[in-house]
């Protein structure tokens, strides 16, 4: 799989920064002064961050990791507003309808881009209805197996799947989640037939994996690595381009036999469409500074993610590529959901 979405896109976006700054330098002194004045006046009151999932999960923790230092930097409270439901759609719709003044923003994850194709009647457009602020971090997924599953590595797993089509059941935290779609991507690329068993969250899926009721699954490093190190499940490989700094003993799927296989989840901040550019730039600039802080970087890495922090244009390109990428996987798998 080409790396044009996720990590490859992130690197390409960083290279585009120098071109963008040249364009910004062409602004007239008057225009530049006006933009600075508007952004300097923001914020004058608390900022609300909509999190479309429950407290304590990956999205919530990522939001708090940057929300706390953001409040300090802008000298205004940053209020976390958890609005879970419908795979993140309830919170995202609320964000899309919010006043576009910068005082309501939201954190979304990879499933946000997949929803554009997964749902036939989405009440917003995953990209066009929003103003991207910054990609906060990307999180590789780890492919794990039950200890009772006979395959000890990727080569053996693929051999079992090909020898007995349909014999392997894989779990996910829900239909359309990054973990589900990454397994669909693997199956499509390798011509495999496997049975998907969706759960309502990672915890019950992991419990059945450890109990031997399910053979394999993808999920985040933060959720799976403790169980791997405790010997309760077996690591097969990571969906990143290089080994994870905190788990060098686990190979990537690319080096294990799937060249170019890169996938995962991510978390990024959006504002409602129509939010003034000066306000978006102010927020984006703060987030970029925040994710470079050593303590914030360490906090994000502890969650199994890689800090990014990029500009609005870069995040928009990234989101567009993610929508297109997952549309192909979803359409080939003939997946559709109703809200």
Regions found by a protein language model. Give the residues of each.
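N-terminal secretory signal peptides that target proteins for export/translocation
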Residues: 1-15
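Bacterial N-terminal signal peptides
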Residues: 17-31
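Sec/Tat signal peptide C-region and signal peptidase I cleavage site
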Residues: 31-37
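N-terminal (or domain-start) structured segment
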Residues: 37-128, 167, 175, 191-220, ...
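An extracytoplasmic/periplasmic, membrane-proximal ligand-sensing/linker region
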Residues: 44-46, 192, 277-339
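C-terminal lobe and pocket-closing loops
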Residues: 138, 152, 224-293, 321-324, ...
């Amino acid at each position: 799989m080409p790396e044009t979405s996720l990590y490859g896109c992130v690197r390409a976006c960083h290279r585009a920064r120098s071109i963008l700054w040249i364009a910004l330098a062409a602004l007239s002194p008057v225009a530049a002064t006006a933009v600075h004045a508007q952004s300097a006046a923001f914020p004058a009151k608390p900022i609300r961050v909509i999190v479309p999932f429950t407290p304590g999960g990956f999205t919530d923790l990522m939001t708090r990791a940057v929300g706390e230092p953001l409040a300090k930097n802008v000298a205004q409270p940053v209020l976390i507003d958890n609005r879970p439901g419908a795979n993140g759609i309830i919170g995202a719709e609320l964000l899309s309808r919010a006043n576009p003044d910068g005082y309501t923003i939201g954190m979304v994850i990879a499933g946000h881009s997949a929803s554009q194709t997964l749902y036939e009647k989405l009440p917003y457009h995953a990209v066009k209805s929003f103003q991207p602020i910054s990609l906060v971090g990307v999180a590789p997924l780890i492919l794990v197996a039950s200890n009772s599953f006979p395959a000890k590595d990727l080569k053996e797993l693929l051999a079992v799947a090909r020898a007995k089509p349909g014999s392997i059941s894989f779990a996910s935290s829900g239909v359309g989640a990054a973990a589900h779609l990454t397994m669909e991507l693997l199956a499509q690329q390798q011509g495999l037939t496997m049975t998907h068993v969706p759960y309502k969250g990672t915890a019950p899926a992991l419990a059945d994996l450890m109990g031997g009721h399910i053979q394999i699954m993808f999920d985040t490093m933060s959720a799976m690595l403790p169980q791997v190190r405790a010997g309760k499940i077996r690591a097969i490989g990571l969906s990143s381009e290089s080994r994870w700094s905190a788990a060098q003993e686990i190979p990537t799927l690319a080096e294990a036999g799937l060249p170019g296989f890169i996938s995962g989840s991510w978390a990024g901040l959006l504002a409602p469409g129509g939010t003034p550019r000066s306000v978006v730039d102010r927020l984006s600039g703060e987030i970029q500074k925040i994710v470079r802080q050593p303590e914030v970087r360490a906090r994000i890495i502890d969650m199994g993610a890689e800090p990014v922090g990029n500009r609005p244009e870069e995040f928009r390109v990234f989101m567009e590529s993610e929508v297109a990428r997952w549309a192909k996987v979803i359409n080939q798998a003939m997946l559709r959901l109703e809200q």
